[in-house]
A protein has these predicted regions:
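Hydrophobic residues within alpha-helical transmembrane segments
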Residues: 24, 53, 57-61, 65, ...
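Short, Lys/Arg-enriched N-terminal segments with co-localized hydrophobic residues
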Residues: 1-14
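Flexible cytoplasmic inter-helical loops of multi-pass small-molecule transporters
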Residues: 105-118
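Selective transmembrane alpha-helices of multi-pass membrane proteins
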Residues: 79-108, 166-169, 173-176, 181-210
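Alpha-helical transmembrane segments and their lipid-water interface positions
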Residues: 36, 58, 62-74, 96-99, ...
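Hydrophobic alpha-helical transmembrane segments in multi-pass integral membrane proteins
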Residues: 69-71, 129-139, 200-210
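Juxtamembrane transmembrane-helix termini in multi-pass membrane transport proteins
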Residues: 16-79, 83, 139-158
Length: 210
């Protein structure tokens, strides 16, 4: 009937009742230091904004796709097999240790002659191995996406927020790295900056086990 169609139409524009708390949670988790943000600053510092775009896209599209898959049912897989999260944590740790080594061992000639070691496909796939990102996505989808009349509506809003916060936060951290480049008056500064980024990356691993 016309009334039922009108009702469905009205429901289709209902905002999630906890949209503000979700947004605050996304904001805090997205903008605080983490593996993706540290690598973004490193890349922005050493390679500039343009050559960091693959990393920005990899994080944004990778994390958003993770939230989409969780929203359409992958979340149940994690609930049935919680050991999967433990495996992800260890695999993510190994990848970050490897990346920290690459950053710390990079030389000035590497940065000027070679392309950015942070590739799109590596960054995209890492979103599925990033313990912080996976945990955050699972928490949000588990608590805020429920089956029902507004399932598609709410899930869509969650995905949009994931895209917005991941893209803006990773871009901001890239610009922070680019800005700090202005203070790089000699090769020693660049070397120490890369060491600092490598250490921050290793420190971010500790948070996975707290």
């Amino acid at each position: 009937s016309f009334s039922s169609i009108r009702k469905r139409s009205t429901n289709s524009i209902i905002m999630h009742p906890e949209i503000l708390s979700i947004s605050l949670f996304w904001f805090v988790t997205a903008y605080t230091p983490g593996p993706n943000n540290v690598v973004a600053s490193y890349s922005g510092f050493n390679f500039g904004i343009k050559r960091t775009i693959p990393h920005i896209l990899g994080v944004t599209l990778g994390f958003t796709s993770l939230v989409i898959f969780l929203s359409i049912g992958l979340i149940n897989f994690f609930k049935l097999f919680p050991v999967i999260q433990t495996i992800i944590k260890y695999l993510g740790t190994l990848f970050l240790i490897y990346l920290a080594y690459k950053i710390a061992s990079s030389t000035i000639s590497d940065e000027t002659k070679k392309e950015n070691p942070v590739k799109f496909i590596e960054t995209f796939l890492f979103q599925y191995l990033n313990p912080k990102g996976v945990s955050v996505a699972i928490i949000v989808v588990s608590n805020y996406v429920e089956l029902g009349d507004n399932y598609i509506n709410y899930a869509t809003q969650i995905v949009i927020l994931a895209f917005l916060f991941s893209s803006t936060s990773i871009t901001l951290w890239t610009f922070i790295g680019k800005f700090l480049r202005k203070f790089a008056t000699n090769d020693k500064f660049i070397k120490y900056f890369n060491y600092a980024m490598s250490v921050l990356l290793l420190l971010s691993i500790i948070t996975f086990y707290i």
